[in-house]
């Protein structure tokens, strides 16, 4: 009787755990930028929705979407990096960013198959996420050399990850061209390696005492596409201060952007974040320095307000200042 009772109690506990683990989760994030060059203003909105529905303890269906709308199509300043990482070259009523199945092989190994964006897994650390510069979401040594499946584009493919306390290893294979449309010859469901080629990415991350170090690379199967590599380090100096250093390089004669490098720091004080970063990139002989200074105020668990100043210098042109007020509501 004692054994049977113990067995029943354990079974009940396991059932409760399974019930909790198999609950679907939903999320919504609204990000709005008010941008100004101190002469004109522009507003950009981004709505992101997510749903994760467990089909079993090891298999989960993931569906994420985005919608983008701007007050006008003309950008305030066509800098080479993109000072706002939610700007789109056109309004996007609805697009899938993730749609597929994730298989949790065990506690350390996962495999995803379906539609996905590279910035779901790469260049998405908490420190990089403090900045609004698009180069912090994907280094320009990739975005200029490939039609890569990063915001607002996605592509069909597979993504593998190994994760333990110290190490995280990732490898991805995607259709060689990203899209966000649902119709036409080029759409988000397209998988045509013969015409589009394949994009391969890999990254190693090492974590130690609050610091993180990343080394990655990519290759497109198109004949003249360059190899790229990147490295960045997030060095924790004190519990609330982190130094950031980044470098990206593309190998090949046909490379549009050969080098990208920069450095900065972040500081967290209670409900406030301070982030400063400066970088340099060169595209076809034209270079641009960019500096970002931002302050994030976490008003509540769901609301963040972030004023940002961008200082940009393109070769012989005058220095350009752009201000940005970002409001983010996350549910």
Regions found by a protein language model. Name each.
Residues 319-331:
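Outer-membrane beta-barrel "beta-signal"
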Residues 51-55, 103, 115, 161-164, ...:
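Residue-level signature of outer-membrane beta-barrel architecture
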Residues 14-37, 61-63, 134, 140:
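Transmembrane beta-strand segments of Gram-negative outer membrane beta-barrel proteins
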Residues 12-13, 74-98, 108-200, 328:
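Surface-exposed coil loops of outer-membrane beta-barrel proteins
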Residues 26-32, 63-67, 113-117, 171-175, ...:
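Transmembrane beta-barrel strands of outer-membrane/channel proteins
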Residues 37-45, 55-99, 104-105:
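Surface-exposed loop and membrane-interface regions of Gram-negative outer-membrane beta-barrel proteins
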Residues 18-28, 55-63, 107-111, 165-169, ...:
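Outer-envelope beta-barrel architecture signal
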Residues 57-58, 165-169, 201, 205-284:
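Detector for outer-membrane/organellar transmembrane beta-barrel domains
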């Amino acid at each position: 009787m004692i054994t049977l009772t113990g067995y029943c109690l354990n079974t009940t506990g396991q059932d409760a755990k399974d019930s909790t683990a198999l609950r679907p989760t939903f999320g919504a994030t609204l990000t709005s930028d008010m941008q100004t060059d101190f002469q004109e203003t522009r507003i950009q909105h981004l709505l992101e929705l997510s749903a994760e529905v467990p089909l079993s303890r090891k298999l989960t269906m993931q569906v994420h979407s985005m919608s983008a709308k701007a007050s006008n199509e003309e950008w305030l300043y066509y800098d080479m990096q993109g000072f706002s990482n939610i700007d789109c070259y056109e309004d996007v009523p609805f697009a899938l960013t993730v749609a597929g199945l994730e298989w949790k092989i065990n506690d350390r190994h996962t495999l995803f198959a379906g539609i996905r964006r590279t910035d779901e897994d790469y260049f998405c650390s908490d420190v990089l996420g403090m900045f609004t510069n698009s180069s912090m979401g994907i280094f320009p040594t990739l975005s200029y050399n490939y039609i890569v499946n990063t915001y607002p584009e996605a592509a069909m493919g597979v993504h593998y990850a190994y994760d333990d306390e110290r190490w995280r290893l990732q490898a991805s294979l995607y259709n060689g061209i990203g899209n966000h449309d649902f119709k036409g010859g080029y759409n988000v469901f397209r998988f045509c390696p013969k015409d589009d080629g394949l994009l391969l990415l890999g990254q190693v991350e090492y974590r130690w005492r609050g610091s993180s170090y990343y080394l990655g690379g990519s290759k497109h199967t198109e004949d003249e596409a360059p190899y790229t590599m990147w490295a960045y380090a997030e060095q924790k100096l004190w519990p609330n201060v982190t130094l950031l250093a980044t470098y990206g390089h593309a190998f090949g004669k046909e490379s549009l952007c050969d080098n990208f490098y920069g450095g900065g720091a972040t500081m967290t004080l209670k409900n406030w974040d301070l982030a400063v970063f400066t970088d340099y990139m060169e595209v076809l002989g034209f270079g641009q320095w960019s500096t970002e200074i931002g302050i994030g105020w976490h008003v509540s668990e769901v609301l963040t307000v972030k004023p940002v100043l961008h200082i940009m210098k393109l070769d012989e042109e005058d220095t350009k200042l752009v201000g940005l007020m970002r409001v983010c509501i996350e549910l």
